[in-house]
């Protein structure tokens, strides 16, 4: 990392690189991801991330990326430009915008993910995000968009008692999922968990197609004491 002096409000420059890949036992590479990035942090605590990714996707058998659009088997090598803006996270309101432009599965993809966050101290946290993807693939029906909207809420009654909620909507499948979790923790994340899950088949206002209620309790003790 580099901390320049008197450079237009720039506080720190953090270049970095990483790689991850997965192979089957027969040597076939299922995925590869080489990430080259530079984080530019300003005196205001805002950040801009400028990166480039080299990707590899190994598709063993054809699959439907969305209903009616099939991606053939093969190995797809692409590059993508990644730009990310993050405002000051220490403020009650913060904003993040992630943009990715590049190739995927033999075609092109534009991905935009704006995220708005609001918090009240360490007690209440909320996060609203939208993941929008615009695809242009060289297959029948390969021009389409797909979006996933998420709302996260968290309230801490005490450091060990929390109520959390996640609501997300997928416009491709027109499904809405809801997850509500209450946790009363002891030591080492043991304790009581109450979880409610629901999936609505036809989006907002649709009838639920799946519901489940989960109760989990764990307790850690020392058998030698």
Residue ranges and their predicted role:
Residues 1-225:
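Exposed, low-structure sequence patches enriched in small/polar residues
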């Amino acid at each position: 990392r580099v901390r320049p002096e008197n450079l237009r409000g720039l506080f720190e420059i953090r270049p970095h690189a990483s790689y991850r890949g997965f192979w089957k036992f027969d040597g076939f590479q299922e995925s590869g991801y080489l990430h080259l990035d530079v984080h530019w942090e300003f005196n205001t605590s805002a950040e801009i991330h400028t990166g480039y990714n080299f990707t590899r996707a190994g598709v063993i058998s054809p699959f439907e990326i969305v209903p009616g659009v099939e991606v053939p088997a093969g190995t797809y090598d692409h590059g993508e430009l990644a730009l990310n803006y993050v405002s000051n996270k220490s403020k009650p309101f913060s904003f993040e915008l992630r943009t990715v432009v590049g190739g995927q599965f033999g075609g092109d993809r534009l991905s935009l993910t704006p995220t708005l966050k609001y918090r009240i101290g360490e007690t209440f946290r909320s996060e609203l995000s939208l993941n929008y993807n615009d695809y242009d693939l060289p297959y029948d029906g390969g021009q389409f968009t797909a979006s996933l909207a998420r709302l996260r809420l968290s309230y801490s009654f005490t450091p060990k008692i929390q109520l959390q909620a996640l609501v997300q909507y997928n416009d491709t499948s027109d499904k809405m999922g809801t997850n509500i979790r209450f946790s009363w923790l002891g030591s080492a994340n043991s304790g009581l968990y109450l979880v409610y899950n629901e999936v609505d088949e036809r989006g907002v206002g649709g009838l639920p197609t799946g519901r489940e209620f989960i109760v989990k309790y764990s307790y850690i003790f020392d058998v030698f004491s």
